[in-house]
Amino acid sequence: MGQKVCAHGFRVGPTLIKGWDSVLYAEKHYKTLFIQDLKIRDLINKGFNQAQVSRVLIERPSNKSIIININAKKPNIIIGRNGSEIDKIKKAIEKMTSLKEVYINIHEVRKFNIDAAIVAQTIALQLEKRVSFRKAMKTAIQASFKQGGQGIRVSCSGRLGGAEIARTEWYIEGRMPLHTLRADIDYSTAEAITTYGIIGVKVWIYKGEYTENKRYN
């Protein structure tokens, strides 16, 4: 079953190595807050796709405040000139949530070659620029090992190279223990919109086994 379940969701839990992307407590308003979280993520991911956002962690410590932590490869794009872009995001979120206390923290992802979300987005951007899918996949694999990755699997699906019939091609190097719960495996997907149609990209990156100090918040 290791190949049929999301590697991230499979490891989410208080005793496992992955944490939730939304931290809140709501008895009756869970549905409303959940939809708000989806809209906030959509606003950030689509509005700043050039920043290559890796993760958006939303915390609601009380009914009056919200804390948004954004991990991105290029945080300067999100910050904007003199913080102009952050102010726009804050105003949009204040209007969306009706909250006056909106806090946004932006973190730079330094080891972006072993971040599955950023790697998938990078491959998708290259495919949109008509770079060969094989070259894009192999380049990502080589870069991952240089930054400490112990295993990587990359998959591309669609009309690869403009072929008439859609197909899936993938490369794998190193270890990929999908069944091992203590294995720190990062997984993400991305879409490349090309003239031939949409090409789906999937990336799995194995970073080593779980240790107490490596656990995500």
From Swiss-Prot:
<dbReference type="Pfam" id="PF07650">
    <property type="entry name" value="KH_2"/>
</dbReference>
<dbReference type="GO" id="GO:0003729">
    <property type="term" value="F:mRNA binding"/>
</dbReference>
<dbReference type="InterPro" id="IPR004087">
    <property type="entry name" value="KH_dom"/>
</dbReference>
<dbReference type="InterPro" id="IPR015946">
    <property type="entry name" value="KH_dom-like_a/b"/>
</dbReference>
<comment type="function">
    <text>Binds the lower part of the 30S subunit head. Binds mRNA in the 70S ribosome, positioning it for translation.</text>
</comment>
<dbReference type="InterPro" id="IPR018280">
    <property type="entry name" value="Ribosomal_uS3_CS"/>
</dbReference>
<comment type="similarity">
    <text>Belongs to the universal ribosomal protein uS3 family.</text>
</comment>
<keyword id="KW-0699">rRNA-binding</keyword>
<feature type="domain" description="KH type-2">
    <location>
        <begin position="40"/>
        <end position="110"/>
    </location>
</feature>
<dbReference type="InterPro" id="IPR009019">
    <property type="entry name" value="KH_sf_prok-type"/>
</dbReference>
<dbReference type="GO" id="GO:0006412">
    <property type="term" value="P:translation"/>
</dbReference>
<comment type="subunit">
    <text>Part of the 30S ribosomal subunit. Forms a tight complex with proteins S10 and S14.</text>
</comment>
<dbReference type="InterPro" id="IPR036419">
    <property type="entry name" value="Ribosomal_S3_C_sf"/>
</dbReference>
<keyword id="KW-0694">RNA-binding</keyword>
<dbReference type="InterPro" id="IPR001351">
    <property type="entry name" value="Ribosomal_uS3_C"/>
</dbReference>
<dbReference type="GO" id="GO:0019843">
    <property type="term" value="F:rRNA binding"/>
</dbReference>
<dbReference type="Pfam" id="PF00189">
    <property type="entry name" value="Ribosomal_S3_C"/>
</dbReference>
<protein>
    <recommendedName>
        <fullName>Small ribosomal subunit protein uS3</fullName>
    </recommendedName>
</protein>
<dbReference type="GO" id="GO:0003735">
    <property type="term" value="F:structural constituent of ribosome"/>
</dbReference>
<dbReference type="GO" id="GO:0022627">
    <property type="term" value="C:cytosolic small ribosomal subunit"/>
</dbReference>
<keyword id="KW-0689">Ribosomal protein</keyword>
<dbReference type="InterPro" id="IPR004044">
    <property type="entry name" value="KH_dom_type_2"/>
</dbReference>
<dbReference type="InterPro" id="IPR005704">
    <property type="entry name" value="Ribosomal_uS3_bac-typ"/>
</dbReference>
<keyword id="KW-0687">Ribonucleoprotein</keyword>
